[in-house]
Amino acid sequence: YRDILFISGCNEQLPHPHRYRVVHQMEQLEAGGYTCDTVYFQELKPWMVRCYGAFVIFRCPMTDTLREFATMAKQMNKPLWYDVDDLVIDTKYTDQIPFLDRMQPEERQAYDQNVRNMGELLSLCDAAVTTTAALAEELKQYVPEVLINRNCASDEMLLLSEAVLKEKQKKNEADGTAKKVRLGYFSGSATHLDDIEMIVPVLKQLLGKNPNLELLIVGILELPVELKLFASQIQMEGFVDYQKLPERIASVDINLAPLTDTIFNRAKSENKWVEAALVQTVTAASNLGAFAEMVQDGEDGVLCRDEAEWLEKLQWLIDDEPARKAIAGRAYGRCSRECVTIFHATGICEWVERHWNLRCAFVLPAMEISGGIRVALLHAEMLVKAGAQVSLFTLEGEAEWYHEGDFHFPVLSAERE
């Protein structure tokens, strides 16, 4: 028996969301004393509902198994919390992603149905957990309560970033004043094509005006046609594993985080700023959504409202190496202290404690019904009617469930478990 099971809708084909919203939140909860497991939603078995006190469902679409699982959890007063880090719960949001218009009709139809299935499962849950204020505001239309638990860096991310940062500092000391300045754009998926294209006119001007300027593009993106004239100043790399990402971000002087202004993008998190801050690389980002919430313009990052600001502020950062390093240093100080799992552990643990129904266990010698055991089971029924979740622990026996009328009690045996 463990406290919380994370049911994840993402596998190794989409690793970053699972890492931030499952692995990192498990780290937070475990720091607060909770025990956790995770399972991929297609590997979920109905019997697993017996063995946990609460369930976090991350970006899962509704399936027959999940419908049965959710029904059983509700019967046992076990809370269901839906975690989502993007507005992929209603096609009114995803219709605003231009990249989806490039899909084949059958592919788009399947994508839209998956979004609707996620929305259906969300509506069955008791509450939602999410990453930003903008996302929370939209989710309140679908569930009665929403917790904002921002994305944050794990202990592993900190260790990886610290190792890279030491090497970066040694290199900077050896090289002295930089001769080249590198911009970097790190894309998680092809859906970000429209974001980088938004600042292509700015990049054209900067690359043309500054022969010492280089651009690194990492991710599942093709070089925009308008930038091919500057191919000698541009380096393209494919998708990078998260363990190697700090080194690639540290290799650039300015991290670019443009976002087109849509409700979908306003709900996105500040991950790119945090990841760059941990290796002391300054971030220039669009002044919207989580960036506007978290970044202090000119203090620990740079925010840009329009093309003119992008051009002006990027040129300033290109020209002023001391300013770049000062801003990056302040971002590092703040993010390494405040944007990490241990800093946020208390908040999510206290929320979980407040939203957990009373948990009770009846320890019985066995499930053979006798007068005393019958009285214990009547008390168990009364507790369930009052909203508690009840488990039966036996010293021996093979029973996994005890059924009495409409009541289904999970049975955990010391002999079997």
Predicted features, each with a name:
Residues 297-308, 316-322:
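Conserved acidic donor-binding segment of nucleotide-sugar-dependent glycosyltransferases
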Residues 8-32, 151-251, 375-381, 386:
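Conserved catalytic-core segment of nucleotide-activated headgroup transferases in glycan assembly
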